């Protein structure tokens, strides 16, 4: 096959017009300007740098002037890190303080120092006889729920939470691995197909100081029933102060979803936000932004039929809707807690495909669209929020890069 490819490429040189193509191809590339400019803002928001025509420039907003800085810096290629295979989870997690490594091995959870010394088991009943397994999820979690982690350290590195699954009664599925190697391998997994019961799932938490294990009450004292809430547990994290463990819980139909918080000292859990859309389905992991004040978070919900943003307290109290649109909000761009404002993209153009930048107060007041609704926009906001770079285009209008102020006024074009 490789020989055929080489011969085909050699024949190209003998085609009519090949020499003319070689001569004009570089000219064509240089004659077309892309129209898109990607910038790096300075921390004070008063200037930014960018690369254009093979040179690096610095633009001063006050002077509206670009100064050439010379050749652009070399692009630093970061080595590609380890990623779990499709449908799988990371097999280990290092503690935030760097002193511990948690990992799963032979269906049990272990702790050790980062160099592997001081190994100790924190579970011992994970085996093929009782079909328990810890620190790893089933295929559906990675494949359909995007869950690529199975263990989660508290911010102070004193606790580690992790999955527990029981695979009793589940039918076995045979997977052939390493098919590109000299010798392949076989993995047997418990995999419920359509109509088969799902596997019981629980969440455990281990305290490194007290050496005590706690199981979270993820189903309000009820056993796993493969249908009600608690069928799937996913989207885990800790609160910034480490006092509660957060997770999403949904039923098999996925038309009810609860965002819940668990007490790692008692195992008790509570509902923070509940979403229900019985006519269809709820989004598995709605967009969320935790605020730096440690008391509030922003939550996206389609409860009105349109995706909007809501401000919540951690106790589950709705403070206020931030947006109340009859069009879809798309994503949060920036939250300025000091000024109490949020910038976000929304489908509020003259058709829903054209993304627009909005600014709104966190109390839901003074929602303002800052961009031209006849165009589609991609923005990069300055750190001080006073300006933004705006790449504007439509399906039949070439992209242009603009400098816009916080009132929506165009200041310059690049």
Feature roles, as predicted:
Residues 82-129, 223-226, 235:
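A conserved hydrophobic secondary-structure block that centers on an alpha-helix together
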Residues 12-18, 64-78, 82, 122-151, ...:
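Predominantly five- to eight-bladed beta-propeller fold
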Residues 61-64, 114-117, 208-211, 264-267, ...:
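Short loop/turn segments that connect beta-strands within beta-propeller blades
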Residues 36-40, 45-47, 51-56, 66-76, ...:
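Non-catalytic accessory segments flanking enzyme active sites
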Residues 49-54, 60, 101-107, 113, ...:
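Beta-strand C-termini and the immediately following turn/loop, strongest in propeller blades
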Residues 32-39, 86-91, 135-155, 229-238, ...:
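Signature of short aromatic-glycine-proline-rich micro-motifs recurring in repeat-based ectodomains
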């Amino acid at each position: 096959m490789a020989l055929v490819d080489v011969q085909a490429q050699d024949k190209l040189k003998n085609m009519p017009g090949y020499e003319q193509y070689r001569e004009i191809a570089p000219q064509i590339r240089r004659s077309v300007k892309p129209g898109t400019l990607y910038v790096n803002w300075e921390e004070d928001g008063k200037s930014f740098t960018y690369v254009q025509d093979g040179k690096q420039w610095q633009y001063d907003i006050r002077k509206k002037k670009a100064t050439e800085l010379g050749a652009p810096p070399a692009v630093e290629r970061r080595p590609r890190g380890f990623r779990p295979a499709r449908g799988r989870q990371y097999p280990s997690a290092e503690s935030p303080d760097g002193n511990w490594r948690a990992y799963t091995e032979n269906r049990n959870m272990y702790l050790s120092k980062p160099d592997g010394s001081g190994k100790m088991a924190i579970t011992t009943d994970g085996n093929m006889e009782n079909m328990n397994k810890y620190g790893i999820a089933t295929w559906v979690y990675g494949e359909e729920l995007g869950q690529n982690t199975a263990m989660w350290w508290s911010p102070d590195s004193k606790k580690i939470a992790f999955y527990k699954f029981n695979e009793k009664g589940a039918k076995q599925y045979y997977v052939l691995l390493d098919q590109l190697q000299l010798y392949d391998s076989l993995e047997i997994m418990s995999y419920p197909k359509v109509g088969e019961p799902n596997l019981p799932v629980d969440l455990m938490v281990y305290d490194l100081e007290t050496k005590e294990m706690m199981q979270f009450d993820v189903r309000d004292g009820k056993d796993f029933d493969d249908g009600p809430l608690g069928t799937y547990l996913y989207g885990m994290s800790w609160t910034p102060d480490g006092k509660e463990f957060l997770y999403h819980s949904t039923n098999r139909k996925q038309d009810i979803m609860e965002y819940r918080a668990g007490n790692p000292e008692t195992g008790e859990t509570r509902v923070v936000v509940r979403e229900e859309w019985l006519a269809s389905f709820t989004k598995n992991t709605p967009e969320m932004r935790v605020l730096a004040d440690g008391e509030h978070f922003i939550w996206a919900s389609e409860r009105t039929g349109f995706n909007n943003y809501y401000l919540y307290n951690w106790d589950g109290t709705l403070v206020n809707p931030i947006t109340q649109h009859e069009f879809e909000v798309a994503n949060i761009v920036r939250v300025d807690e000091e000024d109490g404002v949020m910038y976000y993209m929304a489908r509020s153009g003259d058709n829903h495909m054209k993304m627009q930048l909005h600014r709104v107060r966190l109390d839901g007041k003074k929602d303002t669209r800052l961009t031209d609704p006849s165009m589609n926009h991609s923005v990069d906001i300055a750190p001080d929020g006073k300006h933004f770079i705006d790449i504007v285009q439509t399906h039949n209008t070439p992209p242009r890069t603009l400098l816009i102020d916080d009132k929506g006024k165009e200041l310059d074009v690049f």
